[in-house]
């Protein structure tokens, strides 16, 4: 069993927001709070430490009260760079990542990933959802042993940027969840739709 205090959480908010017209997605208002703050507050009770990975408006993210770290790599290289930043900064044996644009992810996400990782003696546990009769991995929702830092550093030096491709080279366990909890926001219209559909 993995103790939550041995897990650091990182909220990935370092993207370009290209499909939102270039706005900083993590700072978009959702029900009175920035999206990244929703993710942070949902993740915080599930882990021992928490940080945010962001590349713009660092002061706004710092006002959320947790450490904020930009990518070490330039030019917004994607969520894998945020995961790398988390692995570089974490002081615990495990790191879990969540994106800033999925405010309703499961409140038992980390405990279920941790249980599966321990049971399978895996290095990475990744969430997945049932969609159209198939199990689809959600690669940015993953629990990783921080000892994989060197592996990820080498992988990114090759120019590859896909989380799933890197993870596939390690002992990986996939953990199924209900798809509804993983509805994410890529456009301002989708953000409005998510707000309109709230209970």
Swiss-Prot record:
Role this protein plays: Transfers a GMP moiety from GTP to Mo-molybdopterin (Mo-MPT) cofactor (Moco or molybdenum cofactor) to form Mo-molybdopterin guanine dinucleotide (Mo-MGD) cofactor.
This protein is called what? Answer: Molybdenum cofactor guanylyltransferase
Cite the domain annotation text: The N-terminal domain determines nucleotide recognition and specific binding, while the C-terminal domain determines the specific binding to the target protein.
Alphabetical GO biological process terms: bis(molybdopterin guanine dinucleotide)molybdenum biosynthetic process
HAMAP family (alphabetical): MobA (MF_00316)
What are the binding positions for GTP in this chain?
Answer: 12-14, 25, 53, 71, 101
List the Pfam families hit by this protein, alphabetically. NTP_transf_3 (PF12804)
What the record says about family reads: Belongs to the MobA family.
Name the gene behind this protein.
mobA
EC class name: transferase
Q: Mind telling me which SUPFAM superfamilies this protein's record contains?
A: Nucleotide-diphospho-sugar transferases
Q: Which Gene3D superfamilies match?
A: Spore Coat Polysaccharide Biosynthesis Protein SpsA, Chain A
